[in-house]
Amino acid sequence: MGYLYETHMHTSQGSACAHVPGAEMARLYKEAGYTGIVITDHFWGGNTAIDRSLEWADWVNGFCEGYEDAKREGDRIGLQVFFGWESGYNATEFLIYGLDKQWLLDHPEIRDCTVEQQHELVRRSGGIVVHAHPFREAPYILEIRLFPAFVDGVEGINVGNRDPQWN
């Protein structure tokens, strides 16, 4: 028996670019034969759907809604659902895995971290940093920037975008 996981997905609750809410994403991926998914909505410095003028706790609660809905539905239908996020630095993006909502609530300083500081804080806390779609060419990406000393992995395949040129 094989395992199939989607490790980079956005929900309409957390990411401005997404069109489908978390619970529906869970159902769609279960129907497609997936074992599990990781919700990685766009974080503070990226294409987030959450109002940055909110107090930090309110922002985090709103940010986590897509994941929480997907997790509830995943538990109900037998799909593993994990939490992560995609941080953005001038169109250079990183997937963060292994941390949770409480960690975000306890670390508001993550909003202002540099790439280097993010890696240090995430790693010290037990998480990992993966460079998302490092070679994507798109109008919003002015330059391709690589940070080999500040990532634990690199996303090799990124597909499923509405515009195929970004796959």
Question: What does each model-identified segment do?
Answer:
Residues 134:
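Extracellular glycoside hydrolase catalytic/binding regions
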Residues 1-116, 149, 156-167:
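A metal-dependent hydrolase metal-coordination microenvironment
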Residues 2-4, 121-131:
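Short beta-strand/loop segments at the ligand-binding rim of alpha/beta enzyme cores
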Residues 137-141:
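Alpha-helical scaffolding within the catalytic cores
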